[in-house]
């Protein structure tokens, strides 16, 4: 797994074409109207659907106002610098409502649950579950076979670019509603108890809890049983 450099991300955002994509339902005398060179139009008689950049479509709507009877515009962003990740060919289970930006790496058989927000430059390892409403900030890196509990936040670091990102190593379990601050590394096999605020590195194979989080014990068989990762939840159809 590779981690994007902060300056690479900054340049990506700076140089990107800022877009305001829209979907427009339109009704009227539509024959012969030029909705713009980059607009995709699906016109059938006096009704149609347009997909394109708002500035281009808006200009066409204003220029042909007399011909248009009704318009409904769907729009969910303005001057957006980073598109959403194309999910179609990712070998992972990604549930509805997850927001995943471009330049995110997702390993095979990972699970991304509803409401998760994953920012540019994040890396998610094979077989890792990102539970509901988790936030992975820019450049946050999670290893293989981890579980990041519902509502947890892994702080992002894009600005300032010198800041060290959160790194969660393999086989880590993070409970619900935890906060892992920038620069923290959570060591392999560690467990972070629900609600913890982690401000310092977590040693491998330890359990931490509290605010700020402190080591409360080493991993034992009882803890392993309570925090077992279930591979059945990560299984995909064979043809996927």
From Swiss-Prot:
Signal peptide: none annotated. Keywords: Acyltransferase, Amino-acid biosynthesis, Diaminopimelate biosynthesis, Lysine biosynthesis, Repeat, Transferase. Its EC number is 2.3.1.89. It catalyses: (S)-2,3,4,5-tetrahydrodipicolinate + acetyl-CoA + H2O = L-2-acetamido-6-oxoheptanedioate + CoA. InterPro entries: DapH, DapH_N, Hexapep, Trans_hexapeptide_repeat, Trimer_LpxA-like_sf. The keyword Acyltransferase applies. It comes from the Bacteria. Disulfide bonds: none annotated. One of its GO terms (molecular function) is tetrahydrodipicolinate N-acetyltransferase activity. It is an enzyme of class 2 (transferase). The keyword Nucleotide-binding does not apply. GO terms for biological process: diaminopimelate biosynthetic process; lysine biosynthetic process via diaminopimelate. Pathway: Amino-acid biosynthesis; L-lysine biosynthesis via DAP pathway; LL-2,6-diaminopimelate from (S)-tetrahydrodipicolinate (acetylase route): step 1/3. PANTHER family: 2,3,4,5-TETRAHYDROPYRIDINE-2,6-DICARBOXYLATE N-ACETYLTRANSFERASE, ACETYLTRANSFERASE. Belongs to the transferase hexapeptide repeat family. DapH subfamily. Catalyzes the transfer of an acetyl group from acetyl-CoA to tetrahydrodipicolinate. This is 2,3,4,5-tetrahydropyridine-2,6-dicarboxylate N-acetyltransferase. It comes from Halalkalibacterium halodurans (strain ATCC BAA-125 / DSM 18197 / FERM 7344 / JCM 9153 / C-125) (Bacillus halodurans).
């Amino acid at each position: 797994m590779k981690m994007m450099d902060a300056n690479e991300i900054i340049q990506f955002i700076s140089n990107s074409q800022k877009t305001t994509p829209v979907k427009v339902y339109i009704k009227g005398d539509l024959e012969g109207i030029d909705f713009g060179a980059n607009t995709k139009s699906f016109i059938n008689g006096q009704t149609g659907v347009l997909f394109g950049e708002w500035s281009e479509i808006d200009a066409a709507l204003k220029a042909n106002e007399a011909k248009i009877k009704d318009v409904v515009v769907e729009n969910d962003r303005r001057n957006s610098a980073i598109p959403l990740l194309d999910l179609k060919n990712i070998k992972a289970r990604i549930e509805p409502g997850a927001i995943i930006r471009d330049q995110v790496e997702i390993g095979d058989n990972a699970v991304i649950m509803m409401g998760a927000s994953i920012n540019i430059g994040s890396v998610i390892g094979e077989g890792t579950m990102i539970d509901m409403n988790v936030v992975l900030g820019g450049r946050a890196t999670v290893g293989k076979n981890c579980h990041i509990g519902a509502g947890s936040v892994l702080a992002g670091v894009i600005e300032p670019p010198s800041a060290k990102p959160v790194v969660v190593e393999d086989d880590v379990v993070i409970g619900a509603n935890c906060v892992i601050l920038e620069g923290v590394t959570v060591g392999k096999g560690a467990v972070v108890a629900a609600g913890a605020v982690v401000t310092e590195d977590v040693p491998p194979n330890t359990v931490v809890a509290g605010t700020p989080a402190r080591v409360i014990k080493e991993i034992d068989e009882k803890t392993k049983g309570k925090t077992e990762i279930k591979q059945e939840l990560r299984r995909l159809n064979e043809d996927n």
